[in-house]
Amino acid sequence: MVAAWGFDISAVKDVAQYQHVKHRLNEIVSSVLYIRFIFCMFLLSLLVGALMLFDVKMKMLYILFSGHCIASVLFPGWFFQGIQELKYVTYFQLICKLVFVILMVVFIHSKADYLYYPILFSLGSLFGTAYGLYVMFEKYKVRLIGVKMRNVVYRFKRSTSIFYSRIADMIIERSNAILLGNFIGMQEVAYYDLANKIVRLGSFPIMILNQVLYPKVASERNFRLMRKVMAISFWVAILIWGLCVLLAPWGVELLGKGLMEPSVEIVYILSPLIVTNSIIYLQGSPILVAAGYFKAFNITMWCSFGVYVACMLFVFIFNLHTNLLSILIIQLITCLLYTSDAAD
């Protein structure tokens, strides 16, 4: 999330809109790469400073893994998503993993070679990023140009506002396990985690649809098509919901190896999220952000976060089911807010 810093939404929109206007595309790519390069240097400085100031075990591992962080920050996945060529992202990820596996087989033979792992992992990531930048510059003839400071600041501020909304979303998603572990029990965390993964798997097709449609809608501003897709995806989500409920006992038995039976009930409770997610995913980036309603997008996320904080106060009083109910309430409110904003 920190590596993306909101550019996976804002930069994708800009690239999609101006992919055929060469000077604007050069300005967008240059601004984003300059910002991300400075951001990368800043993060590396923080890492080195922290390692020097604090007594951190295995310092060398942190340093060696930093190559992967650099690759993640500089990887132009946002560019390829914007021009609707996601196949390249798949190719680059495949190349990274392939290079990593080959190098690992060649160089790692015992526990004493453990430092090779982060080195090779970083090399694989850096190779994929370098190849991605090469394709962007050579095949699509993108050029780095001088950019006015106000344009750089503008893109940074807009991406930062999206990053803040992502923070709210991340807190909502990640803090459930922390609260359950601290106030209810680690066993419940395990049940919740398995059930949540099954439900998220059910939402995965809609997430992919969001990634594919967002740049197309941002480029063509074809919101009528988007609403047709939403109607279809809504009924598909209901079908997946039914399958999730039907197959929950089998899925929990398979993934939990017969030890996580209480997760079945949690899947039943959380499975309606598949339907609400189908609306939230497609109303958020593809409609609100594509139409330029960044403020409405951010406000909706922080309103949901406020409701989440209010609901979490009851975790101390009640139990796991209170937590699950609060998640459903938050998603329903978020869904209604997105729908209201999109209708306006």
Positions of PLM-derived features:
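Helix-loop junctions and terminal segments of transmembrane helices
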Residues: 3-20, 199-221, 284-290
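Transmembrane helical elements of multi-pass membrane transporters/channels
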Residues: 89, 93-100, 116-137, 149-215
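Membrane-water interface segments that mark the loop-to-transmembrane alpha-helix transition
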Residues: 4-52, 222-244, 295-300
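Membrane-interface junctions at transmembrane-helix termini in multi-pass inner-membrane proteins
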Residues: 69-92, 219, 274-302
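Conserved small/polar residues in nucleotide/adenosyl-binding loops
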Residues: 338-344
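Residue-level recognition of transmembrane alpha-helices
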Residues: 36, 65, 93-97, 118-122, ...
